[in-house]
Each structure stands twice: as structure tokens, then as C-alpha cells.
């Protein structure tokens, strides 16, 4: 009888060990993520691993940010989202995220944003970033699939970030974030609009799909961008 009981305990412990999720867990604002090893996830976040990164290219000095974590999000399979917002010839933002179900994500690509071509592009978009819409009204000709206009507010902060530019962001991302008033890790997006060839942003039709953690890097990046404005 004792042998059966011992065998049952071994089976339970083996299953528990197999089910334990290990993810890379770090935030580059707090500590280095370089060569970071995966560690066991807390009991309240054992479904997926997530990886978020962004860089801001301004001249020859890119600013890099990344965040890796455990998550309860069921992303159904490994998903990767990335897009770029070009503000000027020398100012470009690149955003990238991964959600990996039941396994660690690959390290983010460390892609450095580079400036989009300007001058004879087939798009004309508002392109700037600032603390409010009145301080953000420049336009530029550029290459890209669509124009974007983003307004983000920050919990426990009085600052608002306005970001506009040319972007290769997908329609699905526009629709996911375009419902408005979506909050991600202390950042509320009051507006995320996409359109084509306009000087006054007109939103694409959107559907309310709720908060999606796979797009969180944009929120995290916005915190980084806010620090650039202070």
C-alpha cells in the first residue's frame, strides 16, 4: 500500500514539474536583460512567456528598451507583432512583441529602427511627438502603408504623449488598439487611429477586441518616449 502511495506522489510531482513554466524575466529599466536565463514563473502567471522591445532611433544614437515576463495570456500559439512609426528623417520608433504559449520566447531581434525615406514619398502624414496635440502638428511626405495618430495617458502622471507618423503597422493591430481607452500596464490609449494620405487623421473602422497583451510593447515604449519629453 505504501509503495502505491509513494508511486502516486512521484507521479504528481513529475506532472507538476513538467507543467512548470520557465520564462526569461527582466526589465531593462531595472536590470540588464543580456544573457538572461529563464527562471520559474510565479503561480499566477504560468500560461505563456511574453517578450516586448522597442527602440527609438534619433540620429546615430538609438535608445533600446525591453521587457520579458511570464503571463496568463493564452496566445494559442507563438505570435510576433512588429511595426515602425517614422516621425522625421532622423527619428523613428520600432516596436516588437512576442507571445509564446507554454515555452520561452526567442530573444527579440534587436532590430534597430532606421529612418524612412523622405521627400518624394507617396504618403503625407502628420509626423511629430509631444505632450499635447497643439504641439504636434507638423506633416511630412514619406514611404509607408498608413498614417497613425496615438494619444496615451499615464497612470499617476499628468503628462500625455502624442505620437504621429508614417507606419507599416498592420490593419489588425490598428483594429485591436483602435477601440480606444484601452489600458496596458499603467498606460491608457485614448486614441490609436490609422488612415491613408491625410493631414487630419481619420480612423479605420475598428472593433472592440479588448486588451491584448501581445501589443503591450507599445505601451511600454510610450513610457520610454515620455521620459524623452521630460
Curated annotation (Swiss-Prot):
Lineage start: Eukaryota, Metazoa, Chordata, Craniata, Vertebrata
Carbohydrate attachment residues: 37, 44, 74, 77, 90, 106, 110, 132, 137, 156, 168, 181, 197
GO cellular component terms attached to this protein's record: extracellular space; plasma membrane; side of membrane
Protein name, per record: Ly6/PLAUR domain-containing protein 8
PTM summary: Highly N-glycosylated. Not O-glycosylated. GPI-anchored. The GPI-anchor is cleaved, leading to secretion into the colonic lumen.
Gene that produces this protein: LYPD8
CDD domains cross-referenced by the UniProt entry: TFP_LU_ECD_LYPD8_rpt1, TFP_LU_ECD_LYPD8_rpt2
Family named by the database record: Belongs to the CNF-like-inhibitor family.
Database matches in InterPro entries: CNF-like_PLA2_Inhibitor (IPR050918), LY6_UPA_recep-like (IPR016054), Snake_toxin-like_sf (IPR045860)
Cross-referenced Gene3D superfamilies: CD59
Membrane topology: Lipid-anchor; GPI-anchor
Major localisation: membrane
Keyword Iron: no
Organism of origin: Bos taurus
Function: Secreted protein specifically required to prevent invasion of Gram-negative bacteria in the inner mucus layer of the colon epithelium, a portion of the large intestine which is free of commensal microbiota. Prevents invasion of flagellated microbiota by binding to the flagellum of bacteria, such as P.mirabilis, thereby inhibiting bacterial motility in the intestinal lumen. Segregation of intestinal bacteria and epithelial cells in the colon is required to preserve intestinal homeostasis.
Alphabetical UniProt keywords: Cell membrane, Glycoprotein, GPI-anchor, Lipoprotein, Membrane, Secreted, Signal
GO BP of this protein: defense response to Gram-negative bacterium
Subcellular location: Cell membrane; Secreted
Record's signal peptide: 1-20
